[in-house]
From Swiss-Prot, chain A:
Residues 814-1252 are annotated as: Mediates dimerization. Pathway: tRNA modification; 5-methoxycarbonylmethyl-2-thiouridine-tRNA biosynthesis. It is found in: Cytoplasm; Nucleus; Cytoplasm, Cytoskeleton, Spindle. Residues 1097-1116 are annotated as: Disordered. Homodimer. Component of the elongator complex composed of Elp1, Elp2, Elp3, Elp4, Elp5 and Elp6. The elongator complex associates with and stabilizes microtubules; efficient interaction requires the full complex. Residues 1106-1116 have a biased composition (Basic residues). Disruption phenotype: RNAi-mediated knockdown is lethal in larval third instar (L3) stage. RNAi-mediated knockdown in sensory organ precursor cells abolishes central spindle asymmetry during asymmetric cell division. RNAi-mediated knockdown in adult mushroom body neurons impairs protein synthesis-dependent long-term memory formation. GO terms for biological process: dosage compensation by hyperactivation of X chromosome; establishment of mitotic spindle asymmetry; long-term memory; tRNA wobble base 5-methoxycarbonylmethyl-2-thiouridinylation. This is Elongator complex protein 1. Component of the elongator complex, which is required for multiple tRNA modifications, including mcm5U (5-methoxycarbonylmethyl uridine), mcm5s2U (5-methoxycarbonylmethyl-2-thiouridine), and ncm5U (5-carbamoylmethyl uridine). The elongator complex catalyzes formation of carboxymethyluridine in the wobble base at position 34 in tRNAs. ELP1 binds to tRNA, mediating interaction of the elongator complex with tRNA. Binding by the elongator complex stabilizes microtubules and promotes their growth. Belongs to the ELP1/IKA1 family. The modification Phosphoserine is found at residue 1094. Keywords: Cytoplasm, Cytoskeleton, Microtubule, Nucleus, Phosphoprotein, tRNA processing. It comes from Drosophila melanogaster. The gene is Elp1.
From Swiss-Prot, chain B:
One of its GO terms (biological process) is establishment of mitotic spindle asymmetry. Keywords: Cytoplasm, Cytoskeleton, Microtubule, Nucleus, Repeat, tRNA processing, WD repeat. It comes from Drosophila melanogaster (Fruit fly). Belongs to the WD repeat ELP2 family. The gene is Elp2. Component of the elongator complex, which is required for multiple tRNA modifications, including mcm5U (5-methoxycarbonylmethyl uridine), mcm5s2U (5-methoxycarbonylmethyl-2-thiouridine), and ncm5U (5-carbamoylmethyl uridine). The elongator complex catalyzes the formation of carboxymethyluridine in the wobble base at position 34 in tRNAs. Binding by the elongator complex stabilizes microtubules and promotes their growth. The keyword Iron-sulfur does not apply. Pathway: tRNA modification; 5-methoxycarbonylmethyl-2-thiouridine-tRNA biosynthesis. It is found in: Cytoplasm; Nucleus; Cytoplasm, Cytoskeleton, Spindle. InterPro entries: Elp2, WD40/YVTN_repeat-like_dom_sf, WD40_repeat_CS, WD40_repeat_dom_sf, WD40_rpt. This is Elongator complex protein 2.
Amino acid sequence: MRNLKLRYCKELNAVAHPQHLLLQPELNGGASDIYFVVADNKIYAVQESGDVRLKVIADLPDIVGVEFLQLDNAICVASGAGEVILVDPQTGATSEGTFCDVGIESMAWSPNQEVVAFVTRTHNVVLMTSTFDVIAEQPLDAELDPDQQFVNVGWGKKETQFHGSEGKQAAKQKESDSTFIRDEQELNQDVSISWRGDGEFFVVSYVAAQLGRTFKVYDSEGKLNHTAEKSANLKDSVVWRPTGNWIAVPQQFPNKSTIALFEKNGLRHRELVLPFDLQEEPVVQLRWSEDSDILAIRTCAKEEQRVYLYTIGNYHWYLKQVLIFEQADPLALLHWDTRCGAEHTLHVLKESGKHLVYRWAFAVDRNNSIVGVIDGKRLLLTDFDEAIVPPPMSKIVLKFETYINAFISHGTSLWVYTCDRKIYLNEHIHTLGKELQKPIMLMPDAELSGLHLANLTHFSPHYLLATHSSAGSTRLLLLSYKDNDNKPGEWFYRVHSSVRINGLVNAVAVAPYAMNEFYVQTVNNGHTYEVSLKADKTLKVERSYVQLHEPADQIDWVIVKGCIWDGYTGALVTLRNQHLLHIDGYRIGEDVTSFCVVTNYLVYTQLNAMHFVQLDDRRQVASRNIERGAKIVTAVARKARVVLQLPRGNLEAICPRVLVLELVGDLLERGKYQKAIEMSRKQRINLNIIFDHDVKRFVSSVGAFLNDINEPQWLCLFLSELQNEDFTKGMYSSNYDASKQTYPSDYRVDQKVEYVCRLLEQQMNRFVSRFRLPLITAYVKLGCLEMALQVIWKEQQEDASLADQLLQHLLYLVDVNDLYNVALGTYDFGLVLFVAQKSQKDPKEFLPYLNDLKALPIDYRKFRIDDHLKRYTSALSHLAACGEQHYEEALEYIRKHGLYTDGLAFYREHIEFQKNIYVAYADHLRAIAKLDNASLMYERGGQLQQALLSAKHTLDWQRVLVLAKKLSEPLDQVAQSLVGPLQQQGRHMEAYELVKEHCQDRKRQFDVLLEGHLYSRAIYEAGLEDDDVSEKIAPALLAYGVQLESSLQADLQLFLDYKQRLLDIRRNQAKSGEGYIDTDVNLKEVDLLSDTTSLHSSQYSGTSRRTGKTFRSSKNRRKHERKLFSLKPGNPFEDIALIDALHNHVTKIAQQQQPVRDTCKALLQLANAADADPLAAALQREFKTLLQAVDAALDEIWTPELRGNGLMADHLTGPNVDYLALQKEQRYALLSPLKRFKPQLIMMDWQHEILQ
Amino acid sequence: MQVENLHTSVACNRCTECADWGPNGWIAYGACNAIAIMDPKFQGNSAKVLFTLVEHTKRVNTVRWLDCDKLLSGGDDAIAILWELDETGTTKSFTLKGHTSGVNTVDGIRQQDGSWLLATAAADTTIKLWTFQDNNYVCFQTISLSDGFCFCLRLQLLPKSNQVLLAFSGDDETVSLWSEQVETAGEGDSLGRQFQRKHKLTGHEDWVRGLDFVVDGEDLLLASGSQDNFIRLWRIAPRSKEQMQENRVDLHQLSHNDDEIKVEEKILQLGKEAWYAVSLESVLYGHEGWIYGVHWHKTPDQELRLLSASIDKTVIIWAPTEEGIWLEEVRVGEVGGNSVGFYGGKFSGDGHSIMAHSYQGGFHIWSQDPDRPQLWTPGVIVGGHYGEVRDLAWEHSGAYLMTASADQTTRLHAPWLQDGANPTWHELARPQIHGYDMQALALLSRYKFASGAEEKIVRTFQAPANFIENFRHISGIENDDAGDVLLDSLPKGASVPSLGLSNKAVYKVDSEVESTSKTSKDEYPDNYFVPIALETPPQEETLMQNTLWPELQKLYGHGYEIFALAATADGSLLASTCKASNAEHAQIILWNPSNWKQIQKLSGHQLTVTQLSFSPDSRYLLSVSRDRRWCLYERQDSSVSYQLVASTDKSNGVHTRIIWSCDWSHDGQFFVTSSRDGKVVVWKKEEDCKESSLNGWQANGVLELKNESITAVAFSNSYLSGTDDTYILALGTETGLIKIYQFVRGAWKLLSDLNKSQAHHLTVRRLQFRPGKQLQLASCGEDHLVRIYDIKLT
């Protein structure tokens, strides 16, 4: 679907009567602007730009072939006399290559310039290497080896074959040889050679005796490989397509003129039918472009010379361009540029010395969805919005009188620019396919009739833009058309205004909504200029817009969506063929083969992928694979369709999800839910998007949603597809901006299904008759099968058959057995029967069961049903309603299913029975060792004895006594029995209370107090009773004081020991510098390391450690910890263990404050005991020392690095990891976090002033 | 001359409703295009096909007994036939023409006025209703099912009424109930009667393939068996007008009133003042596959039994418990084997026996043990091939007959000798169950044979020990020296390994202990052969898996499918030919059975050799061919190699079309050839004459039957009793007829002519007289039949 678009045509001046053109290939990136022309036995060097400076570098008569040898940087010239010399292009120095004494007819170098082929005057084919050593020589008319000649494989005789339109009599015709008999001497005797692109084969065309013009195929070894099939009337040009599949030779038939295409083996393969007669317009030159895309045919008729450019697609030859030249200044030669990147550049040299350089580019001419293809005199138009017509067919064909060179389609107008420089204007093509009115023909005015216009572009309704280049500058032309004043009815077009730009303009882009601005780009420096149209219709170059590194081949101005109204912003998309794609100079992609803008997206293709870029933020939103080599033809936004053309020419239309979502989104915005759902279904879009697209809007317009959807089945689909997931953030995130998505306040994504179903259900419930099916679906989605059944059941009363249908629908969604259970759960036998009859259940089984149930009283029936359905709580409530006769069963049921609390609630009215439940509950509680609760329950259940026992077990002595009282048991005795256990539990005070209350033995009272070290209390009691304190209390107290003192001393010692040891270890580690490494060496033998804690050093990898113990069980783990925290000297983790021990110790010490204070106070109270005061003072002193020692040492022990603060973390994870610190950190990680900080000592005022 | 049929063997067609057990105790079933009538209680404990009824021209799809002497059948030839039978066969038949496509199911019922109401359903999506009275039949209604099919239909007289109820199942998964119009307009005029649809029974979730009615007290019970694996029982109970009016059950009030919960009833008005309530009685689930046939039986004390046959290879008899729940009482079926399942099943008239026919056409019969009613034992039955039978061969002394068929099996038929009774013939073994259609067969010795299928190799087999034991026992063989020799060395049996293609010998049989240990490997054992000591001819499931013969050798040599085989009388040579279109492939290969080497290739023919025959003394080998020629090869003295000595050519061959068959006279003096142009020629060596290609063999007698193609010919094994020059020949034709001729010195005389019911109804493929003293002839044909005749000369 591509056309050749003329980028520029520049005119240069060269040498008159040129014979050959030599272009220097690119050297070091830059192309030399010097080229060589052979004319009049001389070789001229021509400077392309600047002043035309001709330099003769060699002079040789009768030049038959020249070649620029790239490696040698020399020009190889062959003369008819047989001389082959090498000429240095700079100095003009010559050196002899070789000599052929019989003279040379033709010379051709292979494309890789390794081999050269000559045909001598004696029709010998000579093949030489680049150093002119002969590889092979043989006469042209040598016969093929017999084993290489054609073999008839026998597809039957000619008589039996099908002859198509020639009919059956064709079978009987003898092949006439008359055409061959013609005197071959009359033919052009030229010999021409053409190499295949890879240099493996070449073809020599010559006139053979008897046969006339024919050709032979030789390989690069000089061996004759094939001869041509017998064909009459071949002409003298021959050219091998560089990709190698065809040899093109003009051939004349009685009824048609063709370019015959032969295969390598010399067999005719197919042909290209020419639109003219070879007799009248003989072909002078055939040239394939270097990339094989374009075939240029130069013809010479009597009155004018023409150049035809053909391309092939889908095996159809399209005539894309026709250039017409007057005979007054005839053409001398055609030459396709061989340089990289300039494959579509054609050099045309005229006899007068004029040098025209045409630069074409392939482009798709699209007008929204309409794409046109030029094919000679026909314009093939297809509207891809309506149909995908595969080329070479098309929706409509417009025929013109002359060949079309370009056309512009914009909006409803169509401008066709033909080879004779007329413009045909048709202004109403929006009715494509219907009869088009006859176009207006615009004649060029005098100025324009001589200009070859390039870059024809539509600008505004009555203006066109075009460029015309000459030498180094370009004129931008604004063309308008008007009525011819002299001849009414005749129209002509003319230059309205123009502006000259320095440099060659190769692309023009017009801003579609601007009307007065456009952009042009020049080849020379890659500059893009903004040009504006002034009010007086003159053009002005405003500013340089974007500077690219390399000039682009294609530029396009696009509007960025949403900006049209507020001053609009646009962007310039530029693409260099097969290269880089830019938006306003910002690089989007590499190796881009084609692009197209559709709505808000820029779509571009790479070799086998298609990408979508959002225009506003230039974010690539989606990609997909496409068939290899496909290029975009056009995109139809309205159908979300992208049409691709594959290399062979066939079309493929795809609906990319991004575009479809855009359409669906648009429909949703406009509230066209039905259409949106239809489109989603058609394009396999998940229906969740209907809701997720805009949650708030959906919620607010849910009524409209329901109204719009006329088919309830669609709603069912929608509901059943719902998922607890926001698709705009997941599957379809390409089209949505997650940050812009807002939700109603009460909505959460993980409850989406429920939310939507509730929402719709509320609405649908108002019009149940319309939304029966979706309502049922919604209930199923919500898990309310019962509600769904009720909807059907209600319907059943009015319309049984409809209810059957609804049930059928429900059965699609739910298993019939589940439904049966749900129906049973309604206790409505009618409903049960209704459902059961639709299932494969045997009536003989379910009927007796239902009848059994029905025979029961209602409540008990419900109980049985609930029990059957395992709804135990509900079952129990119904059983409770059954009353007395089921007490036993209820109790059993409660026990069985553990429904004690429920049972108590349900049986609130049944006070007597409740007691049974309490007892059962208590039994249960006792069984699970909740004795205190059990006691309470027993009490409520009236089982006081049991309550007492349970309370006793928990040593709840108040309750025990109260219960004992209730049971009128001897209180004292009960109380006494409790004292011992209380003491064992360390609850001395309570024990004392009991003893005091219930035992009159004062001694025993004191014993209890003293045993609990409750000296203050003892002193108080003694004081009250005037007992002798010293006698009873003092000895015990003093003994205790001494014991406490020694214990404090021991604590201090222990603390100091630990601390010292810790400091020693640390010092050792610090001293040895690499102390950790020393210890680490031992690690190998130590199996204390936990597998779960990480202690990997840079020296040790975890895998080298021995396997075996995993310390997985908790018992093992504790044992392991104990081992790890062993205080045994030499343990590699001793410091850790010490810290742990110290932490515990310090905490314990801090807790001593109250006991010490109390003890001291008690000692002080013993005023009469001589050694009490010193003891108290000593105690206080000892403790103080202890506390001070602790306090002083805290910071020494808990160093900052132990804490592992945030600072530490930095260099542990940063780029420069401090492995030492990392090791330490890992060691400290063995400690529980709490113990990595120094213990907070909560100090109270524990000292007695008097003891200081 | 009297010809009596000794044995007929044929399988039931692969259709549902294709077999029925009549009130007279006979089982009628569709066998190819014929209906076979079998007496399953022949001589008390045996079974025999009594006769065949031939009138259909295409496959018989369904048969149904209407009465003791009336049988209704339907076939693919779009006709239904009402047969009237007596002890010896058919007396009358009436062809019901009208359908345009195959008739699939039929039923008929006798009405109070003595006339018959017949219903037929066909693939042309119509059901036709006929009345039949006084040998006249009229089709009075055609029910069009638009584009659906009827799978099964039943007619039933309504209780307490003269109304007929028609139930049929269609491909819409429902059962339709139709009855006559209530309007009295056309009463008395049979043509005015019209059936109308009254109700559709829905509930099945797949096609309903079996229906049956039974009268239960005042009610009717309809059983429907479906491909959804369920059987549903529907109750059709008469209702009075009052009941009808009260009947309305309000589902919505069900929980609140005191009525018993019942299944919803549908009230139909089927007569002027007759209302019936239709309700679902029960749903039976027990089969794991499609259910094809259901059949009711009512015991003398009015208890109901329901039989259901399923594709899951089981047949279940259902009985109601006291609570009315239907439970399976007996489940019988096939165990193992490469079969699919049952296509139908029936109770016998007394309900003490049940019959089922399977996918491969085999019959099973189980009888209730009179002493232990829970015990159902399998009984003796006659089966047969379910594809065209292409070759047969008698054992050299006539002890058994072996047949090869396109159903990919070879079967061995032998007489069951019982004291005090005539022997009946049964299938005793199935030596080969193959993956290709069988084509040819040659017996090398009593316990060794070669067979050719539609493949390029000839396979040879030898009987296993287990067969020899059972064969001797059942057929009463004595003095079996060959067997004695083999018994010790032979394998016990054979089986086809799970992933194999050839029968492998099984030497050692796993002891019981081992086989009980269940491991995963045992699920797919390498062999599943179980030796069985037979008292009676074996049942189908035994035949299917336990009577294989181990394969001895594969003979490779032919380039195309094997076509004919022959062996010399002493088994010392085997000759084989294959399909051929040129002389190279048409060569005959001679094999040496002692070492299985090729001895020689004999050329002579241009096209496929259709049959081969060695002369009784093995001196000559005769071959006949598609190229309308015969060739005669003679063994040179003192060598095993044969040489072409005579053949016909275009000038002297009497036959102008393909020569189908050939045979030698027992004395080696004559040989006979028969061809498609209806010519039978007896050739005799007259004098040495080297000039002609015939080399002295001359046509001694030519018999030409116009418009017949003689596809089989055979000489008997002796002269006509009392003569020394009169030969007896049997001819079989393409139309299925068998003719017996005597041949005396060039003169033919027709002795007997068997019609299609007696002989075959499609091409006779092979005829052979039984070796031995008695004159017995075996025949096989494309109609799946294998028959043995006893010929008595009068």
